[in-house]
């Protein structure tokens, strides 16, 4: 509804880069944005931060008919999606990914979660967002390191999908917009077949068993994209050794 309130979740760096533009766009259409600040990266995926977000939504008078927007990388989308699923037993959420990693993978498929002391992503639900909107101009603000992290997830999807996507991720001068499109289409098809991650969708966890262990035992000093890259290499070497 054009008069609904919008909770905009993002960290300070993302807010400084993109927040003003998003708020201006919302206000021009008579929406009423209310920014809820988050810690950057994996640090936002805790019970404490989740509780603070839920309490802020209540204090600001948000209802089930209002909207939550998660602006940022995969961690922000994970946290924002779970908060939206829990508040009033479900308010609509839109993801505005700002990283390649979130654009090719994390923002697609409906998985939400926070971390527990026992491991990564142990508490969450699967609930699809109202929409995922990626502004390709965000690519211009990403470091080469951030692009490489996103490509780790894209390579994973390329291994599974094969065909054109595999060609794209092996191009020494990757066309990121096309890679994102192919990743999104493939993952959406997989999720449509197995939304609750019981069978076919499990393949999308390729490299993540090792990757998540690396993240956790490094205290999340090793970021998700780097951990997935290591996980993929580890599984590939193990498979070669086993003759697969």
Role assignments for model-derived ranges:
Residues 1-67:
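ATP/NTP phosphate-donor binding region
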Residues 79-90, 217-220, 237:
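Alpha-helix C-terminal capping segments
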Residues 8, 46, 97, 135, ...:
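Residue-level signal for inorganic ion chemistry
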Residues 71-73, 97, 223-227:
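Active-site nucleophile and cofactor-binding loops and adjacent substrate-binding regions
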Residues 9, 37, 70-72, 95, ...:
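Short beta-strand segments
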Residues 167-244:
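Active-site segments that bind and position negatively charged phosphate/pyrophosphate groups
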Residues 17, 75-82, 103-104, 213:
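Short glycine/serine/threonine-rich phosphate/pyrophosphate-binding segments
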Residues 81-171:
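A glycine/threonine-rich phosphate-anchoring loop and its flanking beta-alpha core
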């Amino acid at each position: 509804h054009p008069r609904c309130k919008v909770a905009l979740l993002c960290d300070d760096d993302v807010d400084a880069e993109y927040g003003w533009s998003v708020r201006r766009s919302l206000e021009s259409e008579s929406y009423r944005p209310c920014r809820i600040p988050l810690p950057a990266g994996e640090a936002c995926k805790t019970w404490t931060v989740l509780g603070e977000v839920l309490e802020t939504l209540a204090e600001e008078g948000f209802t089930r008919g209002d909207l939550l927007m998660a602006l940022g990388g995969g961690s922000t989308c994970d946290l924002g999606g779970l908060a939206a699923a829990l508040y009033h037993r479900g308010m609509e959420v839109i993801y505005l990914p700002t990283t390649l990693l979130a654009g090719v993978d994390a923002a697609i498929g409906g998985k939400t979660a926070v971390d527990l002391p026992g491991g990564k992503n142990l508490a969450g639900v699967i609930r699809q967002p109202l929409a995922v909107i990626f502004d390709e101009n965000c690519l211009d603000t990403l470091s080469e390191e951030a692009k490489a992290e996103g490509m780790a997830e894209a390579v994973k999807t390329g291994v599974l999908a094969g065909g054109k996507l595999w060609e794209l991720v092996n191009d020494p001068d990757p066309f990121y917009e096309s890679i994102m499109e192919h990743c999104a289409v493939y993952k959406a098809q997989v999720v449509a077949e197995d939304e609750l991650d019981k069978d076919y969708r499990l393949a999308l966890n390729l490299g993540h068993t090792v990757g998540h262990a690396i993240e956790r035992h490094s205290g999340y000093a090793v970021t998700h994209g780097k951990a997935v890259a290591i996980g993929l290499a580890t599984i590939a070497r193990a498979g070669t050794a086993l003759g697969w």
